[in-house]
Amino acid sequence: MRSSWADSVANAEESAPATGAAPTPVANHQNSRPTRSAYVPPHLRGQAPTTTAAPAPAPGPAAVQPSASVQPSGYAAIVGGSRWAGPASGDGTGAVGGPRQSVGGRGGGGGGGGGWNSRPGWDRRDREPNPFANSEAEEATEVDFDTANTGINFDAYEDIPVETSGHDVPPPVNTFAEIDLGDALNENIRRCKYVKPTPVQRYAIPISIAGRDLMACAQTGSGKTAAFCFPIISGIMSSRPPQRPRGSRTAYPLALILSPTRELSVQIHEEARKFAYQTGVRVVVAYGGAPIHQQLRELERGVEILVATPGRLMDLLERARVSLQMVKYLALDEADRMLDMGFEPQIRKIVEQMDMPPRGVRQTMLFSATFPKEIQRMASDFLADYIFLAVGRVGSSTDLIAQRVEFVLEADKRSYLMDLLHAQKANGTHGKQALTLVFVETKRGADALENWLYTNGFPATSIHGDRTQQEREYALRSFKSGATPILVATDVAARGLDIPHVAHVINFDLPNDIDDYVHRIGRTGRAGKSGLATAFFNEGNLSLARPLCELMQEANQEVPQWLERYSARSSFGGGGGRNRRSGGARFGGRDFRRDNRGGGGGGYGGGGGGYGGGGYGGGGGYGGGYGGGQGSTSSWD
């Protein structure tokens, strides 16, 4: 008999790493300038600051280092006094003793509004340094192979269906030993404690090793990063080193990996560095929001693999500090959103108008969780004789993500959210709040909701496109560590991020596109662990009713009768548009060439299965923690 979601996540939380564990207390760093107040994380605001001075420890790659001392409790009691750990000044800015001009501040409702930079305690001196500022220290530091190693429940993935389209598709592999990746890379795979390939890796790696172009559709969290990094690193190691111009300050990478966001670029860079450890393949990252001179210094020291966002890469190309004429491998991660969210002109200019070798000469790999037909047509301009690979959605054939839709009026969303969070905390292990990701549509909405959650006793942080890179990295570290277990985010900011142990995704504002919904709920139920996705639906989401109903039916979820009625109403208009889903059940896309010419290869059928009931276990449906037991470790990105 199927147990409730609350039971499964509670059992898993006992065996999995405790993300909500209290962080080690950090000594308060005294600021030499009394006119600046120290930044205090949301869960500690209102507490009396510590007066004991002590040297601050060196920042680690995943350490959260607030200026105020960190308390062992998961929550900070709301007490009297200023939220920002300092008395308000007469000029209304909240700065102590000085008329500091805030930047990007917003007034308004929602618990006080206010942008991140309007917070008086957040000064540039308090921010984390650029993680890539000290290149010598980076090279000397050993790579931590266990950072993202959280354990995989492989039983949940045995029957995931896979489809391939195209001619002469290389056969899949079952073990890494079947692939000639080179001794150094194989050693790094062992260091990462990867046991066997994930479904997307079983197919994508042989296809890429064979030199074929690839369009791969697989859910975030299914191992896409390793699927394109392994063949790239192996190919660079086995090829003859190119002759680069001597005395030039221009960098000539052999591989280019593009991603839509800064955080995803940093994430890919960290993973690629692990895989390239002691191989002689140097990986460099370049993204906006960080000092460009630091990145230029890294590029001057040599680069084989360049991970970049489109905007920063265009800047480097226009400065003639990067040349693409030696690029042999081009990979686009989250390719559908890069082509759909305004990056298409930049991507076309980079690929077609700069000095990059043309398609057919270079090898191109496109990866994403969804590939609608219109995006496939656009992306096919960059590919030559490619193979289309579709890996079944995790959650469409296994009991991983329980989807729940509630009808909530716009005016009632906040009170309903509070009820969910209270129930989740009460049912969580040791009364701790499970990691919860709340999606909203606008940057202003993210700021307002974060402030409102804080004023109601919930430690929360937020991330969106107006944050500086340091602020976004700090917020992510605070969320991952459990210091602020509620993260309010917009789509773009959280795109493609690999955040382990997210127990609950709440669509506070539903997106306009069903593919965005698929990407959002993919933040939970990762690596074989169970998760819960809750959506707030009302009359404003009528266009999403039909595709949402179809998606839940495909996943064997219980569809509310009221949602079926809304779905029927929206069907009278003919449906279609962006929300007419391609690919049918279980896949984020289907090769559009099949519809054009009726062809298409075979592939691995896989089992099927389903969610197995879709119940929520009564009142415990919002229990804390994360599901799935510990299993064999593998290369999930």
From Swiss-Prot:
Coiled-coil region list = none
Where can the motif Q motif be found?
A: 174-202
What spans are recorded as compositionally biased (Gly residues)? 104-116, 598-610
What InterPro entries does its record include?
DEAD/DEAH_box_helicase_dom (IPR011545), Ded1/Dbp1_DEADc (IPR044763), Helicase_ATP-bd (IPR014001), Helicase_C-like (IPR001650), P-loop_NTPase (IPR027417), RNA_helicase_DEAD_Q_motif (IPR014014)
Which part of the chain is the Helicase C-terminal domain?
Answer: 416-567
E.C. number: 3.6.4.13
Catalytic activity reads: ATP + H2O = ADP + phosphate + H(+)
User: What broad class of enzyme is this?
Assistant: hydrolase
Q: Where is this motif: DEAD box?
A: 333-336
One Pfam family name is DEAD
Where is the segment annotated Disordered? 1-68, 86-141, 570-610
Q: Which UniProt keywords apply?
A: ATP-binding, Helicase, Hydrolase, Nucleotide-binding, RNA-binding
- Where are stretches of biased composition, namely Low complexity? 10-28, 46-68
Q: Which GO terms describe its cellular component?
A: nucleus
Where do the annotations place ATP binding? 218-225
Tell me the Gene3D superfamilies matching this sequence. Answer: P-loop containing nucleotide triphosphate hydrolases
Q: What GO molecular function annotation could you give as one example from this UniProt entry? A: ATP hydrolysis activity
Family that this chain belongs to: Belongs to the DEAD box helicase family. DDX3/DED1 subfamily.
Q: What is this protein called?
A: DEAD-box ATP-dependent RNA helicase 37
